[in-house]
A protein has these predicted regions:
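Mid/C-terminal beta-alpha module of Rossmann-like enzyme folds, strongest
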Residues: 211-269, 305-307
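Amphipathic terminal alpha-helices
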Residues: 285-290, 294-307
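Substrate-positioning beta->alpha
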Residues: 171-177, 191-213, 220
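Flexible, glycine-rich beta-alpha linker
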Residues: 116-117, 159-177
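Conserved Rossmann-fold NAD(P)-dependent oxidoreductase catalytic core, especially the SDR/UDP-sugar
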Residues: 91-135
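NAD(P)H-binding glycine-rich loop region in Rossmannoid oxidoreductase-like domains
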Residues: 37, 48-88, 92
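Active-site Tyr-X1-5-Lys
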Residues: 133-159
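N-terminal Rossmann NAD(P)H-binding glycine-rich loop of SDR-like oxidoreductase domains
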Residues: 5-24
Length: 307
């Protein structure tokens, strides 16, 4: 008999990968705002950000992948939406599990390296202070704290995975924007594009969950290579049979950013954004390698196969 698993966020980028990877080994029930579209037999239609349920099925494993990201809030209302989805969605899920007498053995929470609140640094580990101050980061920090207490009080094994930029087929966010820009010929590199960034392959995250959840704890997951912008640009351009993007000299980029400072929020780039783009930011996944033999793929080796 397959182990039962409750999955939130199955329609999202990472959630889809988790569903496809684990469905052969687990009896999966999904939770989502829309009807079941995932090819499995069981689905609970509900909006976790706004409602609770007393009818969740008893499952040994809960994987909470639903969340809100990739949007810079333009108003207090949009900022509040991060808390509704990331924090209160988590609270409502846990309260629904309790009301349904469906406390799991394992709880897996998909979090983010944004909780550290750093824009540059090398091999930042899990001991770093949680200084994230954006609505996205704060809502994830508060959800982590809530789950730590909730799971601890109920003897539930909690696994928190803090993820950087996630790569895979048709990725969202900045990586997706880079792919679209290079494909259309409208992408411009900046300077030497030597800044390195941590990334991780979605399929690797999905595949390691069954092993990692038995260890429990808090872990960064990365591909361990941390490619430079130039390596990502070259990989994407080669796979798409496009020219390697032209580069703007750093001096000109700084001038453009200076104009952006004057334009305010309307500007696509300013000095702060330029600094983030051109600064190395990597995270240490050594704890995961030691705890459950995390052996990820290099994203630049995998990315060309899905473009």
């Amino acid at each position: 008999m397959k182990t039962s698993l409750l999955l939130t966020g199955a329609s999202g980028f990472l959630g889809t990968e988790i569903l496809h990877t684990l469905r052969s080994a687990y009896d999966i029930t999904t939770i989502g705002r829309n009807g079941a579209e995932y090819g499995q037999t069981s689905h609970v239609k509900m909006d976790l950000s706004r409602e609770k349920s007393k009818e969740l099925p008893a499952c040994e494993v809960v994987v909470h992948c639903a969340g809100k990201a990739h949007v810079v809030p333009a108003s207090p209302e949009e900022a509040d939406e991060f808390y509704k989805v990331n924090l209160y969605g988590t609270v409502h899920l846990c309260e629904s599990l309790e009301a349904s007498d469906a406390i799991p053995v394992y709880f897996v929470f998909i979090s983010t390296v944004a909780v550290y609140g750093v824009d540059e640094g090398v091999l930042i580990n899990e001991q770093h202070a949680l200084n994230g101050d954006t609505p996205y980061a704060r809502s994830k920090i508060q959800a982590e704290h809530y789950l730590t207490e909730w799971c601890g009080q109920r003897d539930v094994q909690l696994l928190i995975l803090r993820l950087p930029l996630i790569a895979g087929p048709e990725p969202p966010g900045n990586l997706g924007a880079m792919i679209r820009g290079i494909s259309s010929g409208r992408y411009l590199s900046i300077g030497e594009a030597a800044a390195r960034k941590s990334v991780v392959w979605a399929g690797d995250v999905a595949a390691v969950i069954p092993l990692a959840m038995k260890e429990g704890g808090v872990y960064n997951l990365t591909d361990g290579y941390h490619p430079s912008f130039r390596e990502l640009e070259t990989c994407i351009a080669t796979a798409l049979r496009k020219k390697t993007p032209s580069a703007i000299p750093m001096g000109i980029a700084k001038m453009i950013a200076g104009v952006g400072n004057l334009l305010g929020k309307r500007a696509p780039v300013n000095s702060d954004k330029l600094r983030k783009i051109t600064s190395t930011l990597t995270f240490d996944d050594g704890k995961a390698r030691r705890a459950f033999n995390w052996q990820p793929s290099r994203v630049i080796d995998k990315l060309s196969s899905v473009l």
